[in-house]
Structure formats: structure tokens, C-alpha cells
Amino acid sequence: MEGRIPLIGEEFPRLEVKTTHGKKILPDDFRGKWFVLFSHPADFTPVCTTEFVAFQKRYDEFKKLNTELIGLSIDQVFSHIKWIEWIKEKLGVEIEFPVIADDLGEVSRRLGLIHPSKGTNTVRAVFIVDPNGIIRAIVYYPQEVGRNIDEILRAVRALQTSDEKGVAIPANWPSNELINDSVIVPPASSVEEARERLESKDFECYDWWFCYKKV
């Protein structure tokens, strides 16, 4: 299975990793919490530096969502440490989350994070993993484009809301063009349920298959 990209809905592979915060076991060390694993091509590169600063600036928001951050690249621990020190010294931002030092590329190959035509650097990817260790979202970005932290936070909030309320989340939520901050109720599974839903005061509906509500 080496090199196969894990799929959404599968359990995150059990991995023992070296990080700037010591050894960790994934996903075990994050049981009971969500975590966002994000890989970056290399330390001491401009786009990756802007991403690390952006993640750190929003770290408290992730923690309020019971969500931890962990970075990853094919670099050694001392490279991560020197880069983090540079960010603190030159940019005034202290990186508080751990960064995986995958110097041999074993973790990256296991997660399918090395593109054959892009050399040996890790691709720019995001895994969102839930408290049970299940992969809930995977996002890839091109090497030349940095990630949007607002969207990653939105995805975590959306997944948590979907799990808690048993609903689906519309585009651009919570500022959807049709239903604003409402959420979508799963379609009715019978004619009777569809009729009841259209008559219910608990929902608003465009039609029996498109009903929504506030949460």
C-alpha cells in the first residue's frame, strides 16, 4: 500500500513520526481531537513561510474547534528548528504546532504525498482527520499557490456541524447565496415524509428535495 493515497472515509494510517515536539504516533496521539495535517514542499521557501505564519495566526481558532495542527515535509528536524527560529526572529511569529521531520520520505510515501514528476519534495496537501482517526477531507494545492486558512477552518466547522446536526452544508457556508447560514436537511426517503416536510414549520423548502433550516 506504500504510495497509495488514503481515501476520505478511511482510517488515517498508523504512523510513528519524528517532530519538532518529539516522537508522536498518528492518529493515536490525537484521539478525541480533530487534527489537520498539512504537508509543505520545503523549509526556507517563501510560500511555505507565509503558510506557516498564517496557520499560527489562526491556531487559537483551530484549538477552539478541538483541532490540532501538524506540519510535514521531507526535511530534517534541525532544518525545521532553524526555520522556525528564523520565522520567530525575522517575522516575530512563534510557531507552536509540531512539524514532522520526514527526512527519509517514508511518511510522505505512505500518504501518497510525493508527485513522481515533481522530484522528492512533498506536495502541498491537507488532511482533515476526526476524533476517531477517520480521514474526512483531503485537499491538494499546486506548488505555486499557498493555502487559504479561512477555507480550512470553514471545512472543519462544516464537518463538525454536519456530524452534530445530521445535515449537509451548502456552498460558501455560512454565507450561502441562497440560504445564508442555514444548513441543508437530508432529502426525504418516502412520499409521506416529503409531504410532511413541505407542511412542517421546522423547515423552509424550495421543493421537497431541497429543504433547509437554521442551526
Curated annotation (Swiss-Prot):
It catalyses: a hydroperoxide + [thioredoxin]-dithiol = an alcohol + [thioredoxin]-disulfide + H2O. Its main location: cytoplasm. The keyword Disulfide bond applies. Pfam families: 1-cysPrx_C, AhpC-TSA. Disulfide bonds join C205-C211. GO terms for cellular component: cytosol. Substrate binds at R124. Its EC number is 1.11.1.24. GO terms for biological process: cell redox homeostasis; cellular response to stress; hydrogen peroxide catabolic process; response to oxidative stress. GO terms for molecular function: thioredoxin peroxidase activity. The active site is at C48 (cysteine sulfenic acid (-soh) intermediate). It comes from the Bacteria. It is found in: Cytoplasm. Residues 6-161 form the Thioredoxin domain. Gene3D superfamilies: Antioxidant, Horf6, Chain A, domain2 (3.30.1020.10), Glutaredoxin (3.40.30.10). Keywords: Antioxidant, Cytoplasm, Disulfide bond, Oxidoreductase, Peroxidase, Redox-active center. It is an enzyme of class 1 (oxidoreductase). The active site is a conserved redox-active cysteine residue, the peroxidatic cysteine (C(P)), which makes the nucleophilic attack on the peroxide substrate. The peroxide oxidizes the C(P)-SH to cysteine sulfenic acid (C(P)-SOH), which then reacts with another cysteine residue, the resolving cysteine (C(R)), to form a disulfide bridge. The disulfide is subsequently reduced by an appropriate electron donor to complete the catalytic cycle. Belongs to the peroxiredoxin family. Prx6 subfamily. NCBIfam families: PRK13189.1. Homodecamer. Pentamer of dimers that assemble into a ring structure. Thiol-specific peroxidase that catalyzes the reduction of hydrogen peroxide and organic hydroperoxides to water and alcohols, respectively. Plays a role in cell protection against oxidative stress by detoxifying peroxides. This is Peroxiredoxin. It comes from Thermotoga petrophila (strain ATCC BAA-488 / DSM 13995 / JCM 10881 / RKU-1).
